[in-house]
Structures are given as structure tokens and as C-alpha cells.
Swiss-Prot record:
The gene is Znf689. Pfam families: KRAB (PF01352), zf-C2H2 (PF00096). SUPFAM superfamilies: beta-beta-alpha zinc fingers (SSF57667), KRAB domain (Kruppel-associated box) (SSF109640). It is found in: Nucleus. There is a cross-link at K455 (Glycyl lysine isopeptide (Lys-Gly) (interchain with G-Cter in SUMO2)). This is Zinc finger protein 689. Residues 128-137 have a biased composition (Basic residues).
Length: 500
């Protein structure tokens, strides 16, 4: 005989409870209404873990009834369970109690059949006089229930909290193996072992082509498709191909626009429950993925994988234009805009365009005047965290990196590397339009504004824009005269001509 399934071990009260009739006093709930009885054959098919869980569920249910004042005399089933024996004892069960339970189950099944007729109406007989036409099928619209507690896992509604707790116990029977780190439950120990690698960071499966490691064998199989170039999943709407079925499912929501899963905290909607679960960690602050090297925690596993490449030095994404390598595909996409000249992010205030969203956000601080990074030593504020870090070195006077040619010292290796190009004459940054070369990336960026005509530094008082920050600073010190012409600088050409 096959082992009984988890729903056979326990049935929720919301599915088996008697329906209250109008005008009658509700009957008190009894233990026989929620208890589950097994025959000797069924009991013999249960695993030891299922028997232990069955004892705990029945005792907990009897305790809940006692808290509600509905326990009554101790049933024979509870007395038998308290003896904690694995042997089936038919004499330990009250035959009258067992017969009442069987009668109750028969009434429940007849009640469920009646409800199914209400939810799914019978097919209508074909109308006379219309030969050759089949009758239209009735729409199957399930009846909605409301007013009771809802299970957060499956969304089922129950008449009371006792029924909900019984339902949760049944779900625990289906998945008896909980994760000690996050509480998630699984049906088999192998699934639990595979899941716990997400917390520990263990990756036992290695790709033979590139050496990349994975925590699950299926993830390795999906990764190997990258080397073969195979994309077996096609979108029927636009023909785009994907390597994973999940990627195709996520893509198809762009055509339908359906987002049925809503965040209860902020109202944001998502196409899949997994995306909603990841989003809700921003509200709860949960970071279940820990780096074993530095103990830093992350909300998403992908963020942990990208972070671990800092320790391993792995950069699996090469740029086909300059052979520079990156640790994530998103950084590669952002870098390739340097070669293509694409600037998809536009400023709404001055029409300046940028290749990265982070650069646009930093630029918008020029319009708002906001400087969110204050120095804790002197109170001076900066728009960028990097500028604050460089400024704080002026307080500590800690400059560990010295130039071998002139002895000048710098606070960061990047500043020293940029300075040493003055002595070597190296100019690694070339303009794609005129082939002019520069020693620093910032100088190339300023030069490219001559070709694009972009002026990203606006004056907040008059709205005039400038290509360079120092030009804006000079403009603020020497604003325009009332007639609109620029006020001449001290020692400028206008003063020298008037002196002549």
C-alpha cells in the first residue's frame, strides 16, 4: 500500500468543518471534528518522522481546543499518543468515537460535492432548433470567500484561526525539513542541502571551460549554454531567444504588462512572487547572503556572486573593443557606451546627456545645489563620496604614496598613477573623433564636449551653461553686466586696449 499523502495526515477545519445554519446556535467545536484517524495499514505506511509530526500536531490541536474551552474529556487517541508507542493499538481507540468521525467525513464529502456544483455549474442541454451548433461552454468562475484569516503561503481563506493553524501544520507535513538560517521548508533533505549553499556560499560544481563555480548542478548546466551559444527558448510574440525558460517568462511580461503581485508596504507591483520577495527585503532589511571572506551581507544572491569576484579577481566579461575585462555584465554594458558614444540618460533641466545613470544623478546635484557628503572634521560638504575621501586626506595629512621622480606624495595610488604620466608623457586616452590624446580620463571627457556641444555646468542664477566647472566658477565671481555683455576680467584684453 502506498504511503498516504500529506493532506491525508491532516485536513484543515476550513475544508471539513460543518457549515453554520441561520437561526441556529452554533455547535461547539470538538476534537473529533479536527482529529485524523488511521487504520493499521495506513499507520504502517507512515515514516518515523511522519509519525512524530503526527503526534505533535494532534497534541497541539488538542491543546488549542483546551485553550478555547472546547477540549472536553481526554479522547482515547490522545491517551494512546501520550504513551509514545509505535505499535498500532486498535483497542486504544473508542469505536464509537471512530464511527462518529467516519460519519462526519461522509457528511463533509457530500457537502464538498454540493459546493462543487455551485462553483462549477453543470453543462446546459443543447437548445432545440439549432442544428450543427454546439452549445457554448459555461464560464468556470470559482466562488470567492472572504472574512476569514488567509494563509500567507498559498492564499487560501479559512473560517477561523484554528483552521488556519491546522492548515499550516498540514503544509509542514508536506515539507518537514526547515532551513535553520531562514526558516524556509523543503520536501526532501537533498533540496535542503542544496538550498543551504546559498547561505554558506559553497560552490562545488565547476565549469570545465572557464572555471566558474556554482552551488547547484542545474545552474552549471544553464551556464554551459553560454559557451555553446544555444538559446532554445523562443518568444512567440517577438521571436527573441533566451537561454533559460525563466528569462523567457520574465520577458513575456513586457508584452502583457501583467504584474499581479503587489507589495503590501509600498504598493509596487511585480510579475513574479520571487521578485516581490526580493523587493520586500528592502523594507525588512533582511540580507540572507553572507560573504565568507569579509562577512558582508547582501539581499540578492547575484549581488553576492559579483562581490565575491573582488576577492577572487575574476573578471569573466571582456570588452571586444579594448580587451578590458569586467566582473559583471552590467558594468561591461556601461563601459561599451564609451566606445559607441551612446548617452541614453538625459537631464530634464539642461538637456545634457550621460552614458550612466549614476553620472546623471551626480549631475542633477548641480541644479539642486545639494551636497549630501559633509566632512565630519570641518563641515565642508561635497557632491561625491570620492571628493570627500580625497578632501579628508588634507586633515589627516596621510600621504603614503610618493612619486619616485619628484618626491611628491599622494593619498591614493590612483592619484599617484595619474601624476606619474606627467613625467613619462604617457597619454592613454584618445579621442575617437580627432585622435587627440590625453593623460587623464577627465581631460578627455572635457575635450569631447567640444565635439558634442554639451555644456553640463549651468548657472543657477541666470541659466547660462558652461563646458567646464572652472568656467562656471569664474562666471560666478564676475557676473554679466546689466546690458548683457560679460564684465571684463582684471588684466583682460579690454583693459589693455583702453590703456593704449
Amino acid at each position: 500500500m502506498a504511503p498516504p499523502s500529506a493532506p491525508l495526515l491532516l485536513r484543515a477545519v476550513g475544508e471539513a468543518g460543518p457549515t453554520r445554519k441561520r437561526g441556529r446556535r452554533p455547535r461547539a467545536l470538538k476534537f473529533v471534528d479536527v482529529a485524523v484517524y488511521f487504520s493499521s495499514e495506513e499507520w504502517g505506511c507512515l515514516q518515523p518522522a511522519q509519525r512524530t509530526l503526527y503526534r505533535d500536531v494532534m497534541r497541539e490541536t488538542y491543546g488549542l481546543l483546551g485553550a478555547l474551552g472546547c477540549a472536553g474529556p481526554k479522547p482515547a487517541l490522545i491517551s494512546w499518543l501520550e504513551r509514545n508507542t509505535d505499535d498500532w493499538e486498535p483497542a486504544a481507540l473508542d469505536p464509537q468515537e471512530y464511527r462518529r468521525w467516519v460519519t462526519f467525513q461522509r457528511k463533509t464529502r457530500s457537502k464538498q460535492k454540493t459546493e462543487e456544483k455551485d462553483v462549477f455549474p453543470p453543462k446546459e442541454a443543447p437548445r432545440k432548433g439549432k442544428r450543427g451548433r454546439k452549445p457554448s461552454k459555461p464560464r468556470l468562475i470559482p466562488r470567492q470567500t472572504s472574512g476569514g484569516p488567509i494563509c500567507p503561503d498559498c492564499g487560501c481563506t479559512f473560517p477561523d484561526h484554528l483552521a488556519l493553524e491546522s492548515h499550516k501544520c498540514a503544509q509542514n507535513l508536506k515539507k518537514p525539513y526547515p532551513c535553520p538560517d531562514c526558516g524556509r521548508r523543503f520536501s526532501y533533505p537533498s533540496l535542503l542541502v542544496s538550498h543551504r549553499r546559498a547561505h554558506s556560499g559553497e560552490c562545488p560544481y565547476v565549469c570545465d571551460q572557464c572555471g566558474k563555480r556554482f552551488s547547484q548542478r542545474k545552474n552549471l548546466s544553464q551556464h554551459q549554454v553560454i559557451h555553446t551559444g544555444e538559446k532554445p527558448y523562443h518568444c512567440p510574440d517577438c521571436g527573441r531567444c533566451f537561454r533559460r525558460s525563466r528569462s523567457l517568462a520574465n520577458h513575456r511580461t513586457t508584452h502583457t504588462g501583467e504584474k499581479p503581485h503587489q507589495c503590501p508596504s509600498c504598493g509596487r507591483r511585480f510579475a513574479y512572487p520571487s521578485l516581490l520577495a526580493i523587493h520586500q527585503r528592502t523594507h525588512t532589511g533582511e540580507k540572507p547572503y553572507t560573504c565568507l571572506e569579509c562577512s558582508r551581507r547582501f539581499r540578492q544572491r547575484t549581488a553576492l556572486v559579483i562581490h565575491q569576484r573582488i576577492h577572487t579577481g575574476e573578471k569573466p566579461y571582456p570588452c571586444p573593443d579594448c580587451e578590458r575585462r569586467f566582473s559583471s555584465s552590467s558594468r561591461l554594458v556601461s563601459h561599451r557606451r564609451v566606445h559607441s558614444g551612446e548617452r541614453p540618460y538625459a537631464c530634464e533641466n539642461c538637456e545634457a546627456r550621460f552614458s550612466q545613470r549614476s553620472t546623471l544623478l551626480q549631475h542633477q546635484l548641480l541644479h539642486t545645489g545639494e551636497k549630501p557628503y559633509p566632512c565630519p572634521d570641518c563641515g565642508r560638504a561635497f557632491r561625491r563620496s570620492g571628493s570627500l575621501a580625497i578632501h579628508r586626506s588634507t586633515h589627516t595629512e596621510e600621504k603614503l604614496h610618493a612619486c619616485d621622480d619628484c618626491g611628491r606624495r599622494f593619498a591614493y595610488p590612483s592619484l599617484l598613477a595619474s601624476h606619474r604620466r606627467v613625467h613619462s608623457g604617457e597619454r592613454p586616452y584618445a579621442c575617437d573623433l580627432c585622435s587627440k590624446r590625453f593623460a587623464q580620463w577627465s581631460h578627455l571627457s572635457q575635450h569631447q564636449l567640444l565635439h558634442t556641444g554639451e555644456k553640463p555646468f549651468p548657472c543657477l542664477e541666470c541659466g547660462r551653461c558652461f563646458r567646464q566647472r572652472w568656467s562656471l566658477a569664474v562666471h560666478k565671481c564676475c557676473p554679466n553686466t546689466p546690458n548683457g555683455s560679460p564684465r571684463p576680467l582684471i588684466g583682460g584684453p579690454s583693459q589693455r586696449s583702453s590703456a593704449l
